[in-house]
Amino acid sequence: MERGVFQFVFRYSKAQQLVLILVVIASLPFYFFSLDIPKQIVDKAIRGSDFPTNYYGLDLEQVPFLMVLCAIFLILVVVNGGFKFFLNVYRGAAGERLLRRLRYQLIERVLRFPRPQFRKTSQGEVVSMVTLETEPLGGFFGDALNLPSYQGGLLLTLMGFMFVQDWKLGLAAIALYPVQGWLIPKLQRQVNALGKERVKSVRRLNERIGEAVTGAHEVHANDTSQYELADYSTRLGKIFDIRYQIYKKKFFIKFVNNFLALLPPFFFYSIGGWLVIVGDMTVGSLIAVLGAYKDVSAPWKMLLGYYQRKEDARIKYEQLIEKFELNDLLEEEKLVAEPDDKPAMTGQLVAANTSLSEDDGLKVVDGASMRVDLPSHFAVVGPPGGGKGEFSQMIARLLNPSGGKISLNDTDLSGLPEAFTGRQISYAGQTPYIFGGTIRDNLLYGLKHRPLREIEYEGSAASARERQISEADVTGNVSHDINANWVDVNAAGADSEDDLVGRMQHYLKIVGLEDDVYSIGLRQNIEPSERPELVENLLAARKKMRERLDEGKVSDYVESFDADKFNSNASVAENILFGTPVG
């Protein structure tokens, strides 16, 4: 990943940033003309006396001349508004695309983390960094070059306009800017340092809260709740102190900005008024300068705010890179590669003098070797904590050996992509993870490697899918359709979807979960809009069952539920409720 935030912006949005700068340059002449029109309206159309006047080849009386100037002013307002609308929308889209790319890169890196890294980084910390801490970066990405070029262009245009009207007033307008340019960044660096410390403190608090949630039983079992609360109180107090210092410095910066911004109008009214009195300046020019300076404060404040945001974004980005830039990441090629030549899971599996060390240097596995002819059954035995579980995970390529190597037919397993190890080698640990979704999704999770059969979209759905692919390509995301059929039925030894269902039932029966899953299914509600075919089949089966009961002349022995009849096989309460209370 790029080490700096501007490197990231330049690499992935150079063309978009160039378009924004060109549009900014094109908009500035129109903005300058919009500043000059009010002066012409006051001095020439309202206070003027030489009529009719020639205006670009047209002889106009006073009122028509006034209306023409007002119409031009209105047109310029619309044009300037159009430029601003385009810039806002375009930079917003550019920023969101960069934010999407950054989040995707971070999520991809999480998938490439070595497993020991998850013992150092809590789940909450990773989630917070990928979602919350990247959010402010999205707004800055779009403004990285657009805001300083646009607001800086407006500021220079306004300054140039004021100097054209009178150089003394122009000089008075910018006299205090060097002071602000020196003082504000100096104060802002102090705020940035505090902000960096605040982020670290909040992360440590998140980690401690995660520990309390995971180890809540230990807290209650040992009566250490007051100790834990004291720790949280101390951490919250530290965060409060940091934030309080940030507030004081930020509002002091705001106070200085406001004070220095209100001094130039004093010079305008005093010096400008004197120039009007002695006849060296027109009233229209003074009004135009006052109006221009009123607009100057906005881009100047935006530029000062941009400096603060730039420093915040730089700190956030560098902290993210620091957390996600690891030396022992799984190579990206191994994560996505689809090799043409896939070695068979036969032959010899050899572990040669393998070892596995913890971060503190403690060896969990030391000098383990084996040679097994595949296919075969074998067991790794040893005392609790003796490393047999870690050795099994090294065979499954879930952990990388610190020393030695594990090979299949002289091919180092660590050099093979996950497309091989993830499909040819399975690992079932003591604490499997259940993903959100259905039981079927979890049972078939190991068969979803690549999309096998795409969905044929039509109409608006096809257009939406094309746009989804286009945006994914632009932002460096994978463009696979999550709604496609990902299940590789052949990998499960099945010939079709129906055959796959039978195999699922077979394996559930082997592990003793068939009745449990069946019972769970009976207790579920079916959403008709999501499973219309299943609902239709169930209603047809109910009707068919009723017909068979009647044909077999056993309907007297089976009493079906009917809302209009009393059911003699149910209690009075169940008849009144037409059901059984839950809970």
Report the location of each language-model feature.
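Membrane-integrated ABC transporters
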Residues: 1-34, 45-73, 79, 83, ...
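An intracellular "coupling" helix at the cytosolic face of ABC transporter transmembrane type-1 domains
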Residues: 7-14, 115-116, 132-141, 145, ...
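Transmembrane helices of ABC transporter permease
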Residues: 17-27, 146-197, 270-281
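Short intracellular "coupling" helices and adjacent cytoplasmic loop segments at the cytosolic face
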Residues: 49, 96, 104-128, 132-134, ...
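Hydrophobic alpha-helical segments in the permease module
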Residues: 73-80, 177-184, 250-264, 270, ...
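Cytosolic ends of transmembrane helices, especially the final helix of ABC transmembrane type-1 domains
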Residues: 221-224, 248, 295-325
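Primarily ABC-family ATPase nucleotide-binding module
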Residues: 324-376
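Helix-to-loop junction immediately C-terminal to a conserved catalytic motif
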Residues: 395-396
